[in-house]
Regions:
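Short helix- or helix-capping micro-motifs
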Residues: 16, 109-118, 163, 167
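Membrane-interface transmembrane helices that cradle and orient dolichyl/undecaprenyl
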Residues: 140-158
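Transmembrane-lumen/periplasm boundary regions of multi-pass, lipid-linked membrane glycan transferases
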Residues: 177-284, 295
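Membrane-interface alpha helices of multi-pass inner-membrane proteins
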Residues: 47, 155-171, 181-182, 205-208
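Transmembrane-helix motifs of polytopic, lipid-linked glycan transferases
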Residues: 79-100, 120, 139-143
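Short acidic/glycine- and proline-prone juxtamembrane loop motifs at membrane-interface regions
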Residues: 124-132
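Transmembrane-helix signature of polytopic, membrane-embedded enzymes
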Residues: 92-115, 134-135
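Membrane-proximal, lumen/periplasm-facing interface regions of secretory-pathway glyco-
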Residues: 306-313, 336-393, 403-419, 442-448, ...
Length: 498
């Protein structure tokens, strides 16, 4: 296969299609417990609205449409995720082809995404909105570069559509737009493209696409920004000097953590050739250098301004994942022949395509090897089956405090509405009578199953004070693929009309 990719680089598309089909089947073979992002999508699939929480709604909309057509199932959740991941790679390959002459280098850059742990591992398990953003980044940059190279009405329209969708994927897409705008202005043909009348069409299309959510955002700014800003300011130091040091150092550390595996692989494969004539540049290396430099400056300004010290690597992934294209550009203009190194390099992603699915299966089927259970192993299916059978009826509403149990329970009871008090803005109609009681569920901690205050308050405020303290029970259910005695605890109660 590695030799075939050198001869036919476009075959990378079929290779990736097969890989994500395998990943889809692997997810179906894994336990049906959902991790946080999967659970959120299962929960949010009940609504098709202009806004949900602190993230823009693009991914949620796609997931909701799929569920409305095919119904809620693990297959519906996993198919959307793997489709988006496949689109990331395909659009990345298209972007690489826009700036690289050699198709082999484009294939190398694309498969280099399998050397970024935050992408090949975290994105496979979580990162729904980030994955959607990566697709829109690739499409947007394709539109920008195509417009710079050969402007047309179609390229301006395409760029506007990608820009609008990008702003619907994640809000920090605005950082990329700012970086791209500066990079365009610094390009030899950039100003002519910006002052072209067709650029107004690009802006108009993007505004129209974003407008419905933008109006929602104006009326829900606190909801959309509060949680993210809270995470950013978490553990922020009080002293000004510490703010100027701790945040930037964390930023630099994350850049190194994300970039290091790719750089190590490239150094091993390309050796001294990687750094030979590294000082050479062309219009596209300068474009990416300016793009990434502007983004870095803006992030540093944010860090210093709000005292952001608790950053997550997923926030930088949408920018640093462009590194392989930049490195391949540098090597191509230095005269390095991709075919000379392609056979050696392609071993790495091909091995990763085998290792990653195997690790996913091993992690969930043999949790004792890792000393802890993953969310996949939480026995929601057995818990729901047990309590519904014991009660002899299904609930009219499932109510939880957090979204992790809410989405998992909704997956097990897809015909029953579910709500999480973590998202008080997302409510739904439900039946409540003697044959359809309300089921309240939470995961008990060291409180011995005492009902969370939020649930008690909801029952009191919504149903009446007489319902604020219902009878509750504890259920211990063995973890999926756990040993006897390895139990997951659930607390629950059935609330009937009085």
């Amino acid at each position: 296969m590695h030799r075939f990719l050198v001869r036919r680089p476009d075959a990378v598309i079929l290779l990736l299609a097969g890989y994500f089909l395998v990943e889809f089947l692997v997810r179906l073979a894994m336990p049906h417990g959902l991790r946080y992002d999967e659970s959120q999508q299962a929960l949010f699939s009940q609504w098709l609205t202009f806004g949900y929480d602190s993230q823009p709604p693009l991914y949620n909309w796609v997931q909701s449409i799929v569920v409305s057509v095919f119904g809620l199932s693990l297959a519906a959740i996993s198919s959307v995720k793997n489709l988006f991941l496949f689109l990331v790679y395909i659009s990345y390959y298209r972007l690489a082809r826009e700036v690289l002459t050699d198709k082999v280098f484009a294939a190398i850059a694309t498969l280099s995404l399998l050397t970024i742990p935050q992408f090949f591992w975290e994105a496979q398990r979580d990162l729904t909105h980030t994955v959607a953003q990566l697709v829109t980044i690739n499409l947007f940059l394709c539109g920008v570069i195509r417009t710079l190279k050969a402007p047309s009405l179609g390229s301006y329209i395409f760029t506007g559509v990608a820009l609008g969708l990008g702003m619907l994927s994640k809000y920090n897409f605005a950082l990329l737009v700012a970086g791209a705008f500066v990079a365009v202005l610094m390009h030899p043909q950039g100003r002519a493209r910006v002052f072209d009348k067709r650029f107004l069409l690009t802006i108009a299309i993007s505004v129209l696409i974003f407008l419905p959510h933008g109006l929602w955002l104006m009326h829900n700014l606190g909801l959309a920004s509060g949680r993210t800003l809270g995470i950013m300011e978490q553990n922020a130091p009080d002293g000004a000097f510490a703010k100027f040091v701790k945040g930037p150092l964390k930023f630099l550390r994350l850049i190194l953590v994300i970039s290091a595996p790719t750089l190590v692989v490239y150094a091993l494969v390309f050796g001294k050739s990687l750094f030979r004539n590294f000082g050479r540049s062309n219009e596209w290396t300068r474009f990416f250098e300016i793009l990434l430099a502007v983004i870095a400056i803006l992030v540093l300004i944010l860090i210093v301004t709000i005292g952001m010290t608790d950053m997550r690597d997923r926030w930088l992934l949408p920018f640093l994942f462009l590194l392989p294209i930049y490195l391949c550009l540098k090597m191509e203009i230095a005269g390095i022949k991709a075919a000379d190194f392609g056979k050696r390099f392609f071993y790495v992603p091909l091995v990763m395509m085998v290792v990653i699915p195997v690790l996913l299966l091993v992690r969930t089927f043999f949790p004792s090897l890792f000393g802890a259970f993953d969310h996949y192993n939480t026995p929601y299916p057995a818990f729901v089956q047990q309590i519904v059978a014991a009660e002899g009826k299904k609930p009219g509403l499932v109510l939880t405090d957090g979204w992790l149990p809410a989405g998992n329970l909704h997956l097990q009871l897809p015909d029953v509405p579910a709500m999480s008090l973590f998202f008080p803005n997302l409510t739904t109609d439900y039946a409540w009578n003697a044959s359809r009681p309300i089921l309240i569920v939470w995961r008990p901690g060291k409180d011995n199953g005492v009902m969370p205050v939020e649930l008690s308050n909801w029952l009191r405020d919504t149903l009446g004070p007489q319902y604020a303290a219902p009878d509750t029970k504890l259920a211990d259910v063995q973890y999926i693929h756990g040993k006897p005695g390895e139990m997951a605890s659930f607390a629950y109660g059935w609330v009937y009309p009085k």
